[in-house]
């Protein structure tokens, strides 16, 4: 018998969740073989979006499937998250490893009570980066058995999609660019925001030059026209609102001022955190 989870529902995972899991895995205690945490996100019935997560302290028992969770810590973290992101709800749990662990049944039982629909998702992440790839698999529990007889639980794979917004795509492209550079041994300092804007503008200019060259070649009968390309160009041009030069300059300058203000505030906060960290680390006399 299937639980009340729609296997046809679309599940979307945001990259920030994977970075949080990897960061927690790298900071795990030396005696810990895996990390476990709570998945948070939104669901509208047709699409489930995993947007956030936090690690839950636990103690493993290698000789059995028993696992002890710090429920007080988990509840406190959930309450703090609800204060900041009240729209996020518990969707399930994540763990690291190559396969579903023996403690998954107990974790499924716990998160079944925490989820509003009673059917948690299980995200399994292989953080060992075997083959230079991060393996991610998503499961949901499916009850199996005969009516009136013994029942069991089977974890069935669920299709998982990756999605990111424009801001995350900028960061992902930057990391990909750094990773693809030959001879790059370590990640360098991230370029200032204005430099990134200049680089993005230069790349946009190159693409516009390519489009104009194609159009001119078609008009000069140097290249055979392609209906698919023509429709794509038409859809792109009609989707861009017509803005005169003066209004565009005002909009661009306003966005630049907002960005400079955000840079200033983030720099001040970063400096304050660094000072607080140093003061906290100073020995008491």
From Swiss-Prot:
Q: What PROSITE patterns would the database entry show?
A: MPN
Cystine residue pairs: none
List this protein's GO terms for biological process.
formation of cytoplasmic translation initiation complex
A single GO molecular function term of this UniProt record? translation initiation factor binding
Q: Does the keyword Transmembrane helix apply?
A: no
The record's annotation in InterPro entries points to: eIF3f, EIF3F/CSN6-like_C, JAMM/MPN+_dom, MPN
The cellular component terms of Gene Ontology attached to this UniProt record, alphabetical and capped at eight, are:
eukaryotic 43S preinitiation complex; eukaryotic 48S preinitiation complex; eukaryotic translation initiation factor 3 complex, eIF3m
Q: Where is the MPN domain?
A: 11-145
Subcellular location field: Cytoplasm
Q: Which UniProt keywords apply?
A: Cytoplasm, Initiation factor, Protein biosynthesis
Q: Name one Pfam family in it.
A: JAB
Outline the subunit composition: Component of the eukaryotic translation initiation factor 3 (eIF-3) complex. The eIF-3 complex interacts with pix.
UniProt similarity note: Belongs to the eIF-3 subunit F family.
Functional note: Component of the eukaryotic translation initiation factor 3 (eIF-3) complex, which is involved in protein synthesis of a specialized repertoire of mRNAs and, together with other initiation factors, stimulates binding of mRNA and methionyl-tRNAi to the 40S ribosome. The eIF-3 complex specifically targets and initiates translation of a subset of mRNAs involved in cell proliferation.
Q: Give the protein name, as stated in the record.
A: Eukaryotic translation initiation factor 3 subunit F-2
What organism does the record attribute this protein to?
Drosophila ananassae
